[in-house]
Each structure stands twice: as structure tokens, then as C-alpha cells.
Amino acid sequence: RMPGVMRNGKKQFLVDTNIGKASWNEWYEWIEGINDDLPEPEGLGDVWDNLPDLSPCLIEGILRKGHKMLIAGPSKAGKSFLQIELCVAIAEGNKWLKWDCAQGKVLYVNLELDRASCLHRFKDVYTTMGIEQPQYLQNIDIWNLRGKSIPMDKLAPKLIRRAAKKDYVAIIIDPIYKVITGDENSADQMANFCNQFDKVCTELGCAVIYCHHHSKGSQGGKKSMDRASGSGVFARDPDALLDLIELETTEALLKQEENNATCQACKEYLDAHFNWQDDLTQDD
């Protein structure tokens, strides 16, 4: 407006001054506070007799769909193989480390291996698990990002956009040190980093599973949640935490495992060829 100037036969006036916000930043903070997308508080009494259903289990007794899980372990301990095995278990609806897995589609975000090595590992894991003729290969998608990784706060929106219509039940990110945003020893920066996993879980409704390495030095005197390298936020943030440690393979342990394998082989043979359970009594 131009005060004193005629417009369409009418004189323009300056109505008021010094109203509104003093700067763009001040106005932006004000409008963000009004237009936030946060949910409203709810009264416990309103839902007491009609509680929402718990999310179904993805890994029985360990992880629910829509939750987060951290796998921590020493460097070069086989964490990638373990996560590939988890991909296969979810895709095929099999057991993983003796835990039942719900069947569904899974996205494996490969940040460390070259494409050929990653694909060969998947086939090797299938073969080692005794699955010669996979039935649900279409349930596994692999996103190869070696050499193209970016910080998680920039990766999350791209990941959400690509996965929005895929109906994944789980997204596995291997490893997270490739996409860490900020200093891993800073609690506030790692809290912001872990918030990106929450964003993926919320937007896609799937579980997010990621692995991280142990800190340097001996881990024997530490609690499991203190072994992951960096800030303690890593251990406090996920809904489930699996920690991998290397056990000393003594002669007694090797003998025990050999006996267990022998007994299992004998049981499988008897189950396949005889009705031995009907012929034996409790005294036999």
C-alpha cells in the first residue's frame, strides 16, 4: 500500500505501524509453534477400557513391528552375515537364532560392501542355511550405497520416499557408522541422529534394525549396554539391544557342541524312519 495515493477512486491510508514480528526468524519461530504437527495430549481415562492393540511381533520375544533394534559387536565379528541371515529368516518366515520371525518384505541397506560381494553373501547365506530353492526371494530388496552414503538426516527422507509403497516389515541398515550425523560421543548430536530412526519407523510403520561396533579395548568388565562405541544414547535409544561377544572355545565347549549336534542328528534320523516315541516309555 502507498499512503496518500488514490487507488480505484479511494485514498489509501497507513492503518498501523510496529505490528507483527520484528524479523523473519522471529516470525518463522512463531508460525512453526502454531503449525506444529505434534499430537494432542490424551487422557488415560478415555482409553482405559479400550487400550490399543500391541504391535505384532517381528522377532518373537525380541522385537515388535515398528520398533528399533541395535546389534552391537566387535569389529569383523560377522555382524553383516548375521543381519543377512535375519533378512533371509524374515523373507522366508524361518527362525533366526532360534527365534521365530514373522514373514514379510525386508530392505537391506548396504553401506559397506560392494554390490557383487553383497549379492554373493546373500546366496552363500541361503546355501549355508540349507535353503537350496528359495521361495520368497521377492521379499528381499537390497539398496547398495557403498561410496554414496550420506548423513542419516539426509538419507532418511530419501529412504522413506523409496520405501513408502513397498510394505516393508523391516529395514536393516548395515553399518550405521557410515551415516552417523555429528560426533558419536556427543549425547545431544546422537539423540538427533537416533531420531532419524524414529522418523523412519513412524513414517513407514516398519522395524528398523541397525548394527554398530564395540568401543576399543576389553569389553569383559562392561555391561552389555555400555559396549557400543560412542555415546550411551546408542544403547538407551533402541527398543531391543543384542550384544555379540566372542566365547573362548575350550575343549569342553567344543565337546559339548559336538554331543549336541550328534544327538540332534540321531533324533532327526529316528523321527524320519521310526515311530520311536510310540515305542519308548518314560522308564526307557
What is each residue range found by the language model?
Residues 37-127, 132-133, 142, 157, ...:
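The Walker A/P-loop phosphate-binding site
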Residues 70-71, 76, 80-81, 150, ...:
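Phosphate-binding/switch region of NTP-binding enzymes
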Residues 101-192, 199:
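Conserved inter-motif catalytic segment of the P-loop NTP-binding fold
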